[in-house]
Amino acid sequence: MNDLILSASHVSKRFATHTALDDVSIDVQRGHIFGLLGHNGAGKTTLIRIINHITAPDSGTVTFDGHPLTQNDVARIGYLPEERGLYKKMKVGEQAVYLAQLKGLSAREAKSRLQAWFEKLEITDWWNKRLEELSKGMQQKVQFITTVVHRPPLLIFDEPFSGFDPLNADLLKREILELRDAGHTVIFSTHNMESVEELCDDIALISHSRVVLSGEVSDVRRRFRNNTYSLTAAGEVLQPVDRLFEITEAGAPDAEGHRTYLLRKSPEVTNAELLRHLVEQVEPITFAEHLPTMRDIFVRTVGADLSTSSAPDHE
């Protein structure tokens, strides 16, 4: 069996004078969670729409499960778009069964699977409510269920956590991890870099319509390592040592009097040398390399913070 469930190769797409995708290539491993990252307007949603046969590329190819992607393959993809699209006036259960039947399930099988999901997410009381009676977060739970109910091998979630409070966002994260562990492959587009570190095996970062960074999350973080270490220590307050290390962050003492520091050592200094100098001042409790976060890497690569992006979404 091919280890890649989906591969996009040299995909480009233009809308009038706007280039949405410029020679984009990604490989999605079977059974992995793949993060598609980038600002609004970077090209993420255009790529997702090409994968779902909503729009066609101007050039390039998309391969699904070892063969060129066709319209028939779309039935094996579950897609949760950022723009939610349920019918407000219909009853929740009636609509969910209808959508499941469109994906090839019989009415009996659809109802059985849906009721199991409704029980799992503790929303059985919503079955006979109209969608317009539910909050945005409740509606998103329903649409999540209708996306996964036919058990497609590939699931695509576009900004799945928007509109959720922290508790429900954590619930959805657990469900996504369970789906991966059950053998599903997940692609999700997000601005939430913390979610990337929690969930993703691999990522591709798109900026100005091109892939500027890709790989396994752990490898990407190691690629951007910068001689920074985390130290938790007892004893006196640690002082920096010229030409050996600087202290970039120092926390207040905890209940036991332990302090946590972030240190940046000089490149020529070995870890053994650093530790030797540290124990002269303090009693180390934990000491480990501190890899940059995905947010830090995003800022360094793209040159702007996610929270300050004002790029229009031309996708």
Per-segment meaning from a language model:
Residues 173-266:
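ABC transporter nucleotide-binding domain
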Residues 73, 224, 302:
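Short, flexible helix/strand-to-coil boundary loops that buttress conserved ligand/catalytic motifs
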Residues 264-315:
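C-terminal coupling/interaction segments
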Residues 104, 229, 303-307:
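Non-catalytic alpha-helical coupling and interface elements of nucleotide-dependent molecular machines
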Residues 97, 194, 218, 276, ...:
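Active-site phosphate/pyrophosphate- and oxyanion-stabilizing loops and adjacent acidic/basic residues
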Residues 3-8, 13-207, 212-213:
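ABC transporter nucleotide-binding domains
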Residues 78, 188, 233, 286-290:
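Small/polar loops that bind or transfer phosphate-bearing groups
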